[in-house]
Curated annotation (Swiss-Prot):
It comes from the Bacteria. Its cofactor is Mg(2+). Belongs to the glycosyltransferase 4 family. MraY subfamily. NCBIfam families: mraY. Keywords: Cell cycle, Cell division, Cell inner membrane, Cell membrane, Cell shape, Cell wall biogenesis/degradation, Magnesium, Membrane, Metal-binding, Peptidoglycan synthesis, Transferase, Transmembrane, Transmembrane helix. InterPro entries: Glycosyl_transferase_4, PNAcMuramoyl-5peptid_Trfase, PNAcMuramoyl-5peptid_Trfase_CS. It comes from Campylobacter jejuni subsp. jejuni serotype O:2 (strain ATCC 700819 / NCTC 11168). Its main location: membrane. This is Phospho-N-acetylmuramoyl-pentapeptide-transferase. It is a multi-pass membrane protein. Its EC number is 2.7.8.13. GO terms for cellular component: plasma membrane. CDD domains: GT_MraY (cd06852). GO terms for molecular function: metal ion binding; phospho-N-acetylmuramoyl-pentapeptide-transferase activity; UDP-N-acetylmuramoyl-L-alanyl-D-glutamyl-meso-2,6-diaminopimelyl-D-alanyl-D-alanine:undecaprenyl-phosphate transferase activity.
Length: 353
């Protein structure tokens, strides 16, 4: 679509905002169109993920809900992005690679569980971690060696970099990608619980990407200046559109789950956006709901191993609230509210520096 701008009547396609808008609506329409067809096919093939044996009783009714919906919304976002991005932009190509590779890891994990009807038959934790490290390196190393991405570490509400991480930045960036990917995966336990906070996080990071990629805005707002970064906003917009199409079928009561193919890709991509926009630390606030879920699991496992006591009735923490009597829809909406507030606070850091 960008290359149509060479024609005199289509010069508006040079604008990132225009192409982002097109990418959003293309992905939204694709997701809305393809998802019901996928649901019908998945039901016919009995492609549903087995429910965790210790899950709350209310989850037993979800055993026939199709999974792997992430394959559809990720595909929709990638197709829409390919129509709209510039192919000579290393940030955009790396971002698409991130989406595709993490989706493939999740898809392999999903297929193992679906085909064997066993929640433990996907990728082993060790194999999944290794695959995520390799995928992260494929996405990150081209940026590092091209010198397009600064290795300096920035913190929220402070305009100067703390220090230069140099080659250690690679390990730190991989840690951010993997942590974000697995955090979203842990959160995806209730209908729409990971989807809406994911949309909020993508929107916030998309704003940072656009501002940092614009030399005038970044200079005025004292943000890191990274030329060419704005092109990734188009992929961001496409994924938001695809997620909104998915949410139509994923909201309570869900007709389809995103599965690991969706949650690992969404989380990995959010982590990637945080890395390239230099918001690795701010991601703790941008993805606060994901952080909360992950910390609850760490506390639960750590407490049980050290003290033989549980901090929560069940982890991740959304299951704890189910156990104490909160209805699923109330938990979901309250977590959405927390995600919205945390992202508004993160956006406040743009001016408060």
């Amino acid at each position: 679509m960008y290359y149509l701008s060479d024609l005199s009547h289509y010069a508006f396609f040079t604008y990132i905002s225009v192409r982002a808008g097109f990418a959003f609506f293309i992905a939204l329409c694709l997701s809305l169109f393809l998802m019901p067809k996928f649901i019908t096919w998945a039901k016919a093939k009995n492609a549903s993920q087995p429910i965790y044996e210790y899950a709350p009783e209310t989850h037993k009714t979800k055993c026939h809900t199709p999974t792997m919906g992430g394959l559809i919304f990720i595909s929709s976002a990638v197709i829409a992005s390919l129509f709209c991005i510039k192919f000579d932009n290393i940030f955009a190509i790396s971002a698409l690679l991130c989406l595709i590779l993490f989706c493939l890891i999740g898809l392999i994990d999903d297929l193992g569980k679906v085909l064997k009807k066993d929640n433990h038959s996907g990728l082993s934790p060790r194999m999944k971690l290794l695959a995520q490290i390799i995928a992260g390196l494929i996405c990150i190393l081209p940026l590092y060696f091209s010198s397009e991405l600064s290795t300096e570490l920035f913190i929220p509400f402070y305009k100067h970099p703390l220090f230069d991480m140099e080659i250690f930045a690679i390990a730190f960036w991989i840690l951010v990608l993997i942590s974000s990917s697995n955090a979203v995966n842990l959160t995806d336990g209730l209908d729409g619980l990971a989807t809406v906070p994911g949309i909020f996080s993508l929107s916030t990071l998309g704003i940072f990407l656009y501002l940092s990629g614009n030399l005038n805005y970044s200079e005025y707002l004292l943000l890191p200046k990274i030329q060419g970064l704005g092109e990734v906003v188009i992929i961001c917009a496409a994924l938001i559109g695809a997620l909104m199409g998915f949410l139509w079928y994923n909201c309570y009561p869900a007709q389809v789950f995103m599965g690991d193919s969706g949650s690992l890709a969404l989380g990995g991509f959010i982590g990637f956006l945080a890395v390239i926009s230099k918001n690795e630390i701010l991601l703790l606030l941008i993805g606060f709901v994901f952080v909360l879920e992950t910390v609850s699991v760490i506390l639960q496992v750590g407490s049980f191993k050290i003290f033989n006591k549980r901090v929560f009735k069940m982890a991740p923490i959304h299951h704890h609230f189910e156990k104490v009597g909160w209805v699923e829809n109330k938990i979901i909406v309250r977590f959405w509210m927390i995600a919205l507030l945390s992202n508004l606070l993160a956006l406040a850091s743009i001016k408060l520096r």
